[in-house]
Amino acid sequence: MNAHPAPNPAPLILLHNVTKVYGHGQAAMHALRGIDINIETGDFMAMMGPSGSGKSTCMNILGCLDTPTAGSYRFEGVEVGTLSRNQRALLRRNYIGFVFQGFNLLARTSALENVELPLIYRGMAPARRHARAREALAAVGLSGWESHSSAELSGGQQQRVAIARALVTEPAVLLADEPTGNLDTARSVEIMELLTRFNTEQGITIVMVTHEAEMAAFARRVVQFLDGRVDGGQSAGPG
């Protein structure tokens, strides 16, 4: 797989009849019940639904943090279910960026060092990773904040650092799990406008989980989950 794949008629991500069951027998819990989702390169898709509807399980499968019980998950044409645990970890590290509700930054580490972490894991030379991290922070509007620790940043700034960290490796897809969940309305809108800009101007593929219809409206389309199923098909986002 390539970080920037050549044009391909197949979707970037294809979920077909994906089922996820936890437990066995009478204790079995069906988190996903045969869902089908296609995600094209450059898409911006929001997943919505009540707690327990299956959207977080779907996100974990997309991020190679979990595997389907049945069905097919293809990433750039590769059947993820046939990969070993180590191969899935490599796919996750090299092709998928993550943004979380809780930011997940190292508290006593500078913004620059937080953004550099994925590049350190890749073995990138210090000078090159410093430059890449600075570019990523500049792209999220944090030039001049490189030396500040997480404790010195607002919630919105911390999420910007987290987005820079997720994008510094130039992933094929960005998975954002409730990226505005810990922010007030004004900061939430700023983060969504930032994600929208990356999607429209740079063509970054984004999949987002949110409980907030106002935030989902920034996506190109919205997929509604209910009781482990995709409810009523896939609708275009309002905005």
Q: Residue ranges of each PLM-predicted region?
A:
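ABC family nucleotide-binding domain
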Residues: 11-226
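ABC-family P-loop ATPase nucleotide-binding domain
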Residues: 1-21, 231-239
